[in-house]
Amino acid sequence: MNQTNPLPEWTDDLSVNVEIIDEDHQAFFRLAALMNDVTATPDNDQLYLIETSINILEEYIEGHFLREQKAMAKADYAYLVEHIAAHDAFADRVTRIIQDYRQTGSIEKIGTLPHLVTDWLNNHIRVVDAQYKGILTNANVDDRPLVYMAAGLDTELVS
């Protein structure tokens, strides 16, 4: 089940001053809140919402991380490699939880995701993303819907 302590929420002090990236970050917080709600009292109707929210989370992780990484590459950001490593480590943690849920159906495990996402994101934005504040601009960032990147429709991959 989900944890009883409240989820961190988006606050304006988390802004990196890049509109589309801020919008992505806000969407992560909203998605975590939805996941928190649907894992609190799961029933058969909620199982569909859980799976849907997991699919959206996977798409958002892949698409948002690629969006940021492309913008950092375009801006010749000095800490791109380290930033990618932080993204990859988080994505791996989330993937392991999702795989466990899909294999076992454990609502308890998937119920840890909302806090994992918001706690990680809150820290990551304040510490890691804050380093590119003032370096990345709206002009650096691909503002297409994340599905283009998450679905592999993007041709300028970061390696």
Residue ranges and their predicted role:
Residues 1-159:
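Small-residue-biased structural context
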